[in-house]
Amino acid sequence: MSKIVVVGANHAGTACINTMLDNFGNENEIVVFDQNSNISFLGCGMALWIGEQIDGAEGLFYSDKEKLEAKGAKVYMNSPVLSIDYDNKVVTAEVEGKEHKESYEKLIFATGSTPILPPIEGVEIVKGNREFKATLENVQFVKLYQNAEEVINKLSDKSQHLDRIAVVGGGYIGVELAEAFERLGKEVVLVDIVDTVLNGYYDKDFTQMMAKNLEDHNIRLALGQTVKAIEGDGKVERLITDKESFDVDMVILAVGFRPNTALAGGKIELFRNGAFLVDKKQETSIPDVYAVGDCATVYDNARKDTSYIALASNAVRTGIVGAYNACGHELEGIGVQGSNGISIYGLHMVSTGLTLEKAKAAGYNATETGFNDLQKPEFMKHDNHEVAIKIVFDKDSREILGAQMVSHDIAISMGIHMFSLAIQEHVTIDKLALTDLFFLPHFNKPYNYITMAALTAEK
């Protein structure tokens, strides 16, 4: 029987642990360390909880210590790993306030990512084992269940008068939180250093649609601005950028995350952004040491190269692959496309692969084709929304490199999966033009937007 130690019980860790227990539990001893007090919190639902679009946080958990131990794992919660002796294969952790040593034969990192801490004048950021705290009251981070709970508790305390909120960061989390706070009746300003929201996921013509959507719902955009300082007498009163000053009562820092690889200790090869560099079996540069989820690299099929794409969907898949290989059952990952989506005030946006800007930066002779149309024939008078699609492809090989879609019709979310597979399998734009796509007025048009975008692609 092999002894496998897992460091971290986040999405990747939970997927990894469950895969090992469900398939190879009789063959292995599984020991888990996690520095948090809870397991499997769905951070993607945090904004829904804060914005009161769901009843509470209970449904945002899908596993816990008891469930994992019932399957046969030994789980240590509130137990940060302090160091690892890779030569002697020993993990040192803090368990119930005491030093605890655990030997291993295989080691799996599922340590996730940590919030990026921007240097901001007037507020000192204190980093602890589990959370980040700011010395100025009402400067908040968003990552853990505890972070969301703290924000909700503060907003529920009417005596604090937290009516004006600045969200720093215009990525997915920042945009979702801006919507959540506005739904609570708060005055919201969204600040980002770049001149658009959702930068990197969509090209600018698409991000402008989301920007207009936010402004139409009374969210003020302060784009292309760098936060310089947060001012206040003990608590937040003002946020200062290089262009403006905003009177606010709370600041949410959502500028992004970086891989949590502090335990590498200079022994494990890291990617350029600090992530564990892994192969397609999720193994690091040290034999028998694996890394899964946000702490590790992935193989990007669009770039045809190693990359870093932190998504829960990638975390689950890499967790499964890492589990098989750590248990001695060889399995290679097939790579990812970075498929993603967002829904704000009923405007749905999905994308996969590379944007045109990213494709050119990656060295492709890239161009795009697009099409705007109704989802269904014009005679379908109800629930018939406009759809915009963009397909990015390489002019030399004709291979599809990426796709973006936006609509108030949620049905587009399924279409992006086809493009994800197309990128993975190196499908050309010309083959897509003749792909068998069914037609029924309840769903689409005989010449639907996917077909038309491909047919009108540059030759």
From Swiss-Prot:
Q: What happens when the gene is disrupted?
A: Reduces total NAD(H) levels by 22.1% and increases the NAD+/NADH ratio by 20.4%. Modest decrease in the ATP pool. Extended lag phase during growth in media. Increases susceptibility to erythromycin, but not to gentamicin, chloramphenicol, rifampicin, penicillin and vancomycin.
SUPFAM superfamilies per the record? FAD/NAD(P)-binding domain, FAD/NAD-linked reductases, dimerisation (C-terminal) domain
The protein's matches in InterPro entries, at most eight in alphabetical order, are given as: FAD-bd_OxRdtase, FAD/NAD-bd_sf, FAD/NAD-binding_dom, FAD/NAD-linked_Rdtase_dimer_sf, Pyr_nucl-diS_OxRdtase_dimer
Keyword Oxidoreductase among UniProt keywords: yes
Principal place of residence: secreted
UniProt entry tagged with the keyword Zinc: no
Q: Which residues carry this modification: Cysteine sulfinic acid (-SO2H)?
A: C44
Cofactor needs: FAD
Keyword tags:
Cell wall, FAD, Flavoprotein, NAD, Oxidation, Oxidoreductase, Redox-active center, Secreted
Q: Where does NAD(+) bind?
A: I173, D192, Y201, G256, A310, G341
Q: Which residues form the active site?
A: H11, C44
Cellular localisation: Secreted, Cell wall
GO cellular component terms given for this protein: extracellular region
E.C. numbers: 1.6.3.4
Q: Give one GO term, molecular function aspect.
A: oxidoreductase activity
The Swiss-Prot or TrEMBL record describes its family as follows:
Belongs to the class-III pyridine nucleotide-disulfide oxidoreductase family.
| Extra facts | Successfuly tested strategy of using drug inhibitors targeting fermentation pathways for their potential as adjuvants to antibiotics.
**PANTHER family named among the record's database cross-references:** NAD(P)H SULFUR OXIDOREDUCTASE (COA-DEPENDENT) (PTHR43429:SF1), PYRIDINE NUCLEOTIDE-DISULFIDE OXIDOREDUCTASE DOMAIN-CONTAINING (PTHR43429)
Main function: Catalyzes the four-electron reduction of molecular oxygen to water. Plays a role in redox balance maintenance. May be involved in mediating bacterial adhesion to host cells. May be considered a potential virulence factor.
Q: What is this protein called?
A: NADH oxidase
Q: Which gene encodes it?
A: nox
